[in-house]
From Swiss-Prot:
Cofactor annotation: FAD
UniProt EC number: 1.-.-.-
Entry GO MF terms: FAD binding; oxidoreductase activity
Protein name (database record): Uncharacterized FAD-linked oxidoreductase ARB_02478
């Protein structure tokens, strides 16, 4: 594909200001800078990757004058909140915030003549078809000192896969699944036995993997989403799963990673080829460690069934709301220690008659187990001013459960989270403090992105925060704003997110971390909250494998890019 030079020139005025430079930090070359490669240089590079260079625009650009396409605009409007559609667009992200940035405008339902800014969507992207494309792209970025980002599906809560004036490597189209009856990592000693596994190319998405796993008769410990990439940031961030109680986090199941390094070389990383690098990849976060091309995971036996428990507690008097929230918080540790994994939301606003909703699941659980475990929920429902209770459903496998309950929430919104892992002690002894925080910030949608006692047998062998060992849930507070919100309104919401992070840290203890894939992009104590005492080791590994700091992203190990509220 040849990109007309006049198209580039016309687009340049639409750019937001170049990537921020920080005093004393490494200034990278962004679109609009004098150091940005000339058009003929880009065209020469494009010829080496079979025309896979894409001039990238925000998802709504097809509905505005410069890039207007009536047919494409109609599809975009129809499928604007469809996560399957958005992951197939080079310039689309799950959150509009990471397309438009602080001041950008390019909205889907505004008149054709309205302005459409570049925002923080990368200026150029390489739609990688294989390892060679990625090797060439990394070397090109290194040669020209470009601001380089890596994008898979764009499900990124921390804004790590976009950047103003950046050059992007897009791995979404790397597809392929290979199921192994007996897999041995490269370099493993002869006495190491092979185990069942699956090798997933970077672009594979969770729902497709679940469908294939069902056909293979195995279980894959992926996340609670449909379109999230199974072999990208989900894994490097830890990867909480509905099966984490039994099989741990996604990183605990990783046997091997194939990637392209900062030197533009393809490598296979596992516990035998490079133990430190393998440690960093399993929980070190974001794209700080290279461009992942495939991941090999353990697989597990298929359960006989999936039992689901759903509880809903409604209030008929407002005085009951605090009581319901506090008592359910205190009940959660026993439920998850009995092997149930769940997701729940609280409502503190007076207009909502439902105080608490939660869904749990457990493979192979019996009805007797359900009745005993959820008895506290039914007891809460008998309190004055409270109705509801818990019910159970059974599905033949996880795929059938997925068809009924798996969704991709908050698509095409501006939602950001503030979160912390919480222990049994916090849930039982500091429940009232958590309730007070919920009522202090009633519009933040408090809830649990996961309720799970994680199997942490591998915790010391991965970079994931050690507080997962004692956690029983991930409590989260979310803020959002309308696309057309004022700059003042946006800043207020972001500051609220940062404030809640601080308050949560005070309640749970500053030594307690969070799940970095669902953390605040403005987390003030990010090194400690994401990795704790593991950060020093990670930084040392980062300096060895990426001495020029080519791979950078917001609040990633060794980064000099720190987004501020």
């Amino acid at each position: 594909m040849k990109i007309p030079s006049q198209q580039v020139l016309l687009a340049l005025p639409l750019l937001a200001s170049p990537a921020q430079s920080y005093p004393g930090k490494h200034p990278r070359c962004s679109a609009g800078d004098a150091c940005w490669p000339k058009e003929h240089v880009w065209q020469d590079f494009n010829s080496t990757i079979s025309g896979r260079l894409i001039r990238t625009f925000p998802a709504a650009a097809v509905c505005h004058t410069a890039q207007y396409d009536a047919a494409a605009c109609s599809v975009a409007k129809e499928r604007w909140t469809d996560s399957f559609w958005r992951t197939n667009q080079t310039g689309a992200y799950s959150a509009i915030l990471w397309e438009l940035g602080e001041k950008g405008q390019c909205f889907i339902n505004t008149p054709k003549e309205d302005r459409c800014d570049q925002g923080i969507v990368p200026y150029y992207s390489v739609s990688a078809s294989g390892v060679k494309d990625i090797e060439k792209a990394v070397k090109f970025a290194d040669k020209h000192d470009l601001y380089l980002v890596v994008k898979n599906t764009g499900h990124d809560h921390l804004g790590r896969s976009s950047g103003s004036g950046a050059f992007s490597i897009w791995t979404h189209n790397l597809k392929g699944k290979e199921w192994h009856k007996s897999f041995k990592p490269k370099g493993a000693p002869s006495n190491v036995s092979g185990i069942p596994a699956v090798t997933l190319q970077a672009g594979e998405q969770l729902l497709d993997v679940y469908k294939a796993a069902a056909a293979e008769g195995v279980t894959f410990a992926g996340g609670s989403a449909q379109t999230v990439g199974a072999a990208g940031g989900f894994m490097t961030g830890g990867g909480v799963s509905p099966f984490s109680h039994f099989y741990g986090l996604a990183v605990d199941n990783v046997l091997e990673v194939n990637l392209v390094t900062a030197q533009g070389k393809a490598k296979t990383i596992n516990q035998y080829t490079d133990p430190d690098y393998f440690y960093a990849l399993r929980g070190g976060g974001g794209s700080a460690w290279g461009v992942i091309t495939s991941v090999t995971y353990k697989t597990h036996p298929k359960p006989t069934h999936i039992r689901v428990g759903i509880a809903q507690l409604n209030i008929t008097t407002e005085d009951s709301r605090r009581v319901v929230i506090e008592k359910t918080l205190q009940a959660l540790p026993d439920i998850t220690e009995a092997g149930w994994v769940g997701y729940g939301v609280y409502a503190t606003e007076k207009s909502n008659p439902t105080a608490f909703q939660v869904i749990f699941l457990q493979p192979n659980a019996t009805m007797e187990n359900f009745n005993k475990t959820f008895e506290p929920m039914n007891e809460i429902a008998t309190l004055p001013g409270v109705t509801g209770g818990a019910v159970s459903y059974v599905f033949p496998d996880f795929l059938e459960y997925s068809k009924n309950f798996l969704r991709d929430p908050n698509i095409a919104t501006n939602v950001i989270d503030a979160s912390r892992l919480v222990s049994r002690q916090v849930l039982t002894e500091r429940a009232r403090d958590l309730v007070d925080l919920m009522f202090e910030y009633p519009t933040t949608g408090p809830g649990f992105n996961s309720i799970v006692k994680v199997n942490s047998d591998e915790r010391d062998n991965t970079a994931v925060h050690s507080s997962f060992k004692n956690s029983r849930a991930l409590i989260s507070f979310s803020v959002d704003w309308a696309d057309n919100a004022s700059e003042k309104e946006k800043k207020a919401a972001k500051k609220t997110s940062a404030e809640v992070s601080k308050r949560l840290a005070e309640i749970v203890g500053k030594e307690t971390g969070t799940y970095l894939n669902e953390a605040s992009p403005y987390e003030p104590d990010w090194q400690n909250a994401f990795w704790g005492d593991k950060y020093a080791r990670l930084l040392s590994i980062k300096r060895r494998i990426d001495p020029k700091n080519l791979f950078v992203c917001n609040r990633c190990v060794g980064t000099d890019i720190i987004l501020e509220p």
